[in-house]
Amino acid sequence: MEGKIISVNGPVVDIYFPNDVPHIYEALEVENPIKNEKLVLETRILFGENKVRAIALGSTEGISRGLTVKRTFHPISVPVSEEILGRVVNVFGEPIDGGEKIRGEVTPIIKNAAEFRRVQPSYSILETGIKAIDLLTPFPQGGKIGLFGGAGVGKTVLIMELIHNVAVAHGGISVFAGIGERSREGNELWLEMKESGVLSKAALVFGQMNEPPGVRMRVPLTALTIAEYFRDYLGKDVLLLMDNIFRYVQAGMEVSSMLGRIPSAVGYQPTLITELGEVEERILSTDTGSITAVQAVYVPADDLTDPAPATIFSHLDSTLVLSRSIAEMGIYPAVDPLASSSQILEPKFVGYEHAEVARKVVEILQHYESLKDIISILGVEELSEEDRIIVNRARKIQMFLSQPLFVASAYTNIPGVYVPREKTIEGFKAIIEGEVDDLPEDAFYMVGTLEDVKKKAEEHGALMY
């Protein structure tokens, strides 16, 4: 079953098939005579008499009209087995780390989500060891979590910290999808995981910035297929990390434009909701295991109402918003406690004490936010005694939400800290109840637990009796 190329326009290739026409999403193969390698195409549109329009998942340099295209009769497929752990692969499951070819059951990357009757919602908490997350936006195991932020506010660093903390502390399987991000960052992550000894329990799938849009659009599906294998066949709880899901949307926008579809709001593809649903709805907890997905989401121009972040929001269980104004204060991770949220921050899931402490922390920060205009005009001295206490505690809460990260210790020279959830609750409870009103603000900056705060205050000789 062969066809002939009749047109090449960048990554878009039109092919004529005299007999049977390929199915939508079927993978096609053409031999590149200049590079002596196989180029994979994906069927996207059937048009005219026996013609198809396909998107190339590689460079079309050397591809010309008249070349023979072969059908494969299946979608893009990848080999899945335990051999993929510790390896770095591309969208086709081929090694790009210089290692041996991966053997395993060849599985199509385009498929339906798990059957409705197999879905089992999970409400257990995935402890991250990061105070701002564990207190205000607890992650549900088997849930979907989004890290929202503009350029340079720390999304990738936080993703790498989560890999370090969750993979090291919990020892589970991790699958990382590098979608349209910098190749340098992918290389750094690979070396970091090698050094920390977690690479043997992780699979990395890369389709970076220099790849064609067809590849960037399929990398999340390859990573999901690998994660589903560990969940469904080996009964594992899998941590799936995607950096950056916005680049998946961008790739879809490029493909949509090349296929001649009329764009919708702000130039996005008209199929934006459908395309995101195809990825997000496959991230599920089932009767055999779970997939917990942490997704970095780039926010264009720091605008959370942009159609891409706004559509992604609707799929998530926890949303972590990183703020540029907080990053400018030197507080890292730059989590915005008032914009972030979690569906499981309720007493029945996290316990009464945790929910109550989190509520009071947010209440104090909201009160402080409402006083900022008065402070900037009249100064703190003009506030009532009660308001001054609120401001004092709010500033300490802000400082205490900062934390030294393991993956950033090489740059900050401050060793990273893993803070258990109980210690996090204990520390913030002490602040809101006024137990540490006599300690200076500086003592709360870039420390782990309440003990570290007291130790830092003593070292600076600032403890007041």
Swiss-Prot record:
PROSITE patterns: ATPASE_ALPHA_BETA (PS00152). ATP binds at residues 149-156. SMART domains: AAA. Keywords: ATP synthesis, ATP-binding, Cell inner membrane, Cell membrane, CF(1), Hydrogen ion transport, Ion transport, Membrane, Nucleotide-binding, Translocase, Transport. Its EC number is 7.1.2.2. It comes from the Bacteria. Its main location: membrane. It is a peripheral membrane protein. One of its GO terms (molecular function) is ATP hydrolysis activity. One of its GO terms (cellular component) is plasma membrane. It holds the Pfam family ATP-synt_VA_C. It catalyses: ATP + H2O + 4 H(+)(in) = ADP + phosphate + 5 H(+)(out). Produces ATP from ADP in the presence of a proton gradient across the membrane. The catalytic sites are hosted primarily by the beta subunits. Belongs to the ATPase alpha/beta chains family. This is ATP synthase subunit beta. The lineage of its organism: Bacteria, Pseudomonadati, Dictyoglomota, Dictyoglomia, Dictyoglomales.
